[in-house]
Amino acid sequence: MEKWWLNSMLSNEDLGRRCGLSASLGPIGNTSGSEEPIINDSEKNVNSWSGRGSYSCSNVDYLFNLGGVKDVWSLISGETFWVRDSNGDSYSIYFDIENKIFEIDTDSYFLGELESLFSSYLNLNNGSKSYNRYYDHYVYDTRHSWKSHINSCIDSYIRSETNMDSCIPNGSNNSSDNYIYSYICSDSERGSDRGSSNLKTSGVSDSDFGRHNDLDRNKRYRHLWVQCENCYGLNYKKFFSSKMNICEQCGYHLKMSSSDRIELLIDPGTWDPMDENMVSMDPIEFHSEEDPYRDRINSYQIETGLAEAVQTGIGKLNGIPIAIGVMDFKFMGGSMGSVVGEKITRLIEYATDRSLPVIMVCASGGARMQEGSLSLMQMAKISSALYNYQSNKKLFYVSILTSPTTGGVTASFGMLGDIIIAEPNAYIAFAGKRVIEQTLKKTVPEGSQVAEYLFNKGLFDPIVPRNLLKGVPSELFQFHGFFPRP
C-alpha cells in the first residue's frame, strides 16, 4: 500500500505548479488560516467515483493522510485521503497520480468510520487539544513539526540541476514526472513496517529517500539515477560519470564501463583503438537451448556497444604514449575468451615492438566457460607474451585491479604487473566466496577478499583512489624513463 504526504506540496504554490498539481487539484481552495497560499484554481465540479453525480467543493481547510492509523488499511486504498472543509463537511478523495485520477466521495458511513478510527488513534497517542486547532475534527496536524524540512528537501531536490521546469509545465506524463511524484511526494515505508508506522515528523532525514526498502521502485527510474550498492544512496546519473562513478554519499567506487575508464585515463583526442572488429565465432560450438552462445554474444554487443569484453589501443597518458587494455565487466562479466586473450596478446606484442609501457585495467569474472579449454589457454598465451615483454625487453607493465577481479585473470596477467595497483574496496580473488565454501566446506571470513585486507597481506602495491588513478601511473612511467612526447 502506498501513502502520500500531500500537505507539504499543497502549501507551496510554486512547487504545485511545477509538479502539475494545479490541474488535478483545482477544486481545493485556500483558507484564511493557512500559513502559506494553497493552490487555488477556479471552483468547478468533480465527478464522483461512486457514480452519484458531482460535487462542488471549494475552500477546503486541510488535506491529510491516514497512514499512521493502523486499522485503516482495510478501509481505504493506497491513494485515498480524508478532507474536511471550513463548513465541517467531510469528503473522501481518491488520488491516483500516475493515471491522473482525482475523485471525491461523500459517503457518510465511510467517513463516519474514519472519524471514529482517527478519534481512537488520537486518544491512544494522547493527542493534545492545545496543539492543533483542527483537533475538534479529529485531524492531527503534523504541519508545524515537519513542513519546513520537507519543503526544503523538495525545493532543493527539484531545483538541483534537474531542469524540471522544462518538462513538467506541458503536462506530459513522462518518467521524470512520475519520478518527482514518487520521491518528492515521499512514498512512505511499506511492507513489514506497516504495523509500526506513525505519521512522519521532523525526524525525516535526506538519506531516507534512498533506503533499501525502495529498491523495487528505483528500478523504474534507472535512467535518471544510479543507486549505490554499498549505502543505497541515489546519485544523479547525468553527473555520475563526471564524478568518476564514485558515490556522493559514502565515497564507494562503483563499476565503470571500459569507455569511461578510457576517458578517465587517456588524454582527449589521443585514443587509437586496436582490433575493434575481432569477435568470437563460437569455437567449440557451445550449445544451450535456453541461451545459445552466439545469441548471448549478440545481445551483449547490442547492450554495451562493444564487440568483446576488452578494449585495447594506443593513447597518451599525460602526454606519455602507452598501450592500454581495459576490460568491461558489463560484457558477459568481463569473462576472458579466445578473442579477449588474442586482443591482449596482440597489444603486448605491439608494445614490445615499439617499447611502450603497458597498462591493463582488470575487471573480470575469469575464463569464459562457453569456450572451454580454449579460454584457459589464454592465460598461458598472455603470460608468455608478458614474459618476453618484461624479462627480455625490460619494459614496464602496470596492472590495475578493479572490482571484481577474479578467476583466470587474477591467476595470470592480473598479478604479473611490475606494479600492481588496486582500487579501494575492490573485490579481488581467485575463487569466489561461494565456490570456496561449497568446495572446502569452510566459512570464508567477511572482508577477506577485499583490497584493503589483501593489501595488508602484501598481495599488491598501492591502493589508489579513482581521482588519482591517472596521476600515479604517470609518475611511475616517468620514474622508469618514459616521458611525455609532443
Curated annotation (Swiss-Prot):
Q: Which GO terms describe its cellular component?
A: acetyl-CoA carboxylase complex; chloroplast stroma
Question: Record's InterPro entries?
Answer: AcCoA_carboxyl_beta, Acetyl_CoA_COase_Trfase_b_su, ClpP/crotonase-like_dom_sf, COA_CT_N
From the Swiss-Prot or TrEMBL record, state where the protein is found: Plastid, Chloroplast stroma
Q: Which domain of life is it from?
A: Eukaryota
Cite the cofactor comment.
Binds 1 zinc ion per subunit.
Tell me the ranges covered by the CoA carboxyltransferase N-terminal domain, including all copies: 224-486
Q: Which top EC class applies here? A: transferase
What EC number(s) is this enzyme filed under? 2.1.3.15
Per UniProt, the keywords (alphabetical) are: ATP-binding, Chloroplast, Fatty acid biosynthesis, Fatty acid metabolism, Lipid biosynthesis, Lipid metabolism, Metal-binding, Nucleotide-binding, Plastid, Transferase, Zinc, Zinc-finger
Q: So where does Zn(2+) get bound?
A: C228, C231, C247, C250
Q: Which reaction does it catalyse?
A: N(6)-carboxybiotinyl-L-lysyl-[protein] + acetyl-CoA = N(6)-biotinyl-L-lysyl-[protein] + malonyl-CoA
Entry cofactors = Zn(2+)
A GO biological-process term: malonyl-CoA biosynthetic process
Q: Does the keyword Coiled coil apply?
A: no
Q: Name one GO molecular function term.
A: acetyl-CoA carboxylase activity
| Family per similarity comment | Belongs to the AccD/PCCB family.
**Known role:** Component of the acetyl coenzyme A carboxylase (ACC) complex. Biotin carboxylase (BC) catalyzes the carboxylation of biotin on its carrier protein (BCCP) and then the CO(2) group is transferred by the transcarboxylase to acetyl-CoA to form malonyl-CoA.
Q: What's the subunit arrangement here?
A: Acetyl-CoA carboxylase is a heterohexamer composed of biotin carboxyl carrier protein, biotin carboxylase and 2 subunits each of ACCase subunit alpha and ACCase plastid-coded subunit beta (accD).
Q: What name does the UniProt record give this protein?
A: Acetyl-coenzyme A carboxylase carboxyl transferase subunit beta, chloroplastic
Q: Which organism is it from?
A: Nymphaea alba
Gene that specifies this protein: accD
